[in-house]
Amino acid sequence: MIYKILLINFFLVFSSYSNDIHDSFENFVVGATLNLNELNTQKSNLFLKDFTYLTPANAAKQTIVHPKPNTWNWAKINKMLDFANLHNLDLRIHGPIGPQSSKWIKDDIRTSDELMLNLVEFMTESCIKFSKEPSVKWMDVVNETILSSGKWHGPKPGNNKWENPWLKIGLDENEFPIYILKSFEIATKLAPNISLVFNQNAGFQPRLWDKLKKSVKYIRSKGYRVDGIGWQGHLLLSKSTYGFVNDLDKGIKDLSNLIDWAHENDLDFHVTELDYFVEDKSNLNNDLLDQKMIYSRIINLLKDKSKNGIVTLNFWDMGERFKKGKGYFQSIYSKELEPNPSYELLNNILK
């Protein structure tokens, strides 16, 4: 009889423990990015082995879908949607209004009316289309709108620079960008079943994130939804993220505080484009060990914060990505698609 009681108690304790484990992970969603040319390849097979959360790279951006008047091209994102539906994946659409815009939009002769018309057309058709897709769970509405200085990201001369031409549309009576309000207005109205994300690059410069926090509250004050905020996490790509890596304890604390603020304000938190940049590969083995250590700190934090609200993590690409004139972006697999040291960290969050 005593044996039976002990056995029952053990079962109850074990069941409770198992449920706690399950509950602690159900708010933490982990995935990766694939490009169109990577579908039905070894890389996509590796993706399907571990993930069900996909970001379809840049296939949904304005520069591809609606680069200029009377020009539309849904072919790339349609193929990504087909892939997601075939494999029962959840998608975050990365087609935000921001710097990754067509040359036509960036041309200096563009008027504010022309920019607004293209924005309204693109956002309207995108929201109508993706709201009908059961695989689409999240959508980046705007991206890279604030500089690390805290100033609004705006236009530059020419059409071949990293710039944000949409600011030319103007500011409202409270000095807030009209294009941001219009983007969230359209998404709120036409994508009611998609979680709307305000995505942002750089590190944890206080002026930047203070402005983003005020922006979220201002957008909501107009009656529009903001359901989540995103931090890209392109580590060591620019000076704006050097501080996160060079003073990791402070960087993790800053990230922790931002996630807490998000959850306290009924926002999901997304790490949207995590990778690790190295300028050359002369010391790659050590660089990859550093990457693993930094990723471990980030992932452990995200796991812990998922107890308080939804947290997602997206690895930008699966393998090494080379950018001419820049260097090498490292992810969880090597150029040859062999697991990098960072891949080992997935054992604790995917199993």
Which sequence ranges carry the predicted segments?
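Substrate-binding cleft and catalytic face of glycoside hydrolase catalytic domains
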Residues: 49-67, 76-203, 267, 276-281, ...
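Aromatic/hydrophobic pocket-lining residues that form the small-molecule binding cavity
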Residues: 47, 73, 77, 115-123, ...
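Glycoside hydrolase catalytic-domain groove-lining segments
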Residues: 75, 82-85, 173-199, 206-282, ...
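Aromatic-rich peripheral "rim/lid" segments of glycoside hydrolase catalytic domains that contact
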Residues: 66, 108, 129, 140, ...
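Short, acidic/polar
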Residues: 34-50, 118-127, 207-219, 292-301
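Sec-dependent signal peptide recognition
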Residues: 1-9
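Boundary/entry segment of secreted carbohydrate-active catalytic domains
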Residues: 19-53, 57
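N-terminal signal peptide c-region/cleavage motif recognized by signal peptidases
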Residues: 10-18
